Amino acid sequence: MTRVLSILLLVLVTNSIQSQSLQIIKSPNALPFNDKKVKIFLGGSIDMGKADNWQSNLEAQLKNKNIILFNPRRDDWNKDWKPISADSNFRKQVEWELAALELSDIIIMYFAPNSQSPISLLEFGMYAKSKKLMVVCPEGFWRKGNVDIVCERYNIEMYNSLELLVEALKNRVKQEPIF
């Protein structure tokens, strides 16, 4: 009987530890609508794969946090998909991003220098009044002035680097209520 209890306790502890770690959900995987963890959308420069993979760097820095990251950067992106609503792969991507943005408690927007990021600008505008945004827009982003002014107007948290955002995010996640 003691052995059975020991095994049961080990299983419970293991499950508890696993549930206390970072979970990364990439498009097009299913979104966890009923999970109580803080959910963070990694929005920002991808530019059809031309931008640095800043998302993986952020994932590594948050590996010990009990949160969920929604990463729209696809490992299987196909440049031949047409950006039209009739293309089922493209539609699935856009619908995944919209659902993930809505589900997120925090939305990170990173506008990389020398990138254009038109979809990120669209999503930034959609959520400017939401109080969910944390923004990094360093010198060199082609519309930095627009981003700066919108952040000022709507009192959006803005950082000069991803490193500063990560530190602020870690502090915010400590204080974020679990719904």
Role assignments for model-derived ranges:
Residues 1-20:
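Bacterial Sec-dependent N-terminal signal peptides
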Residues 18-179:
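Conserved catalytic or regulatory cores that recognize and/or transform ribose-phosphate-containing ligands
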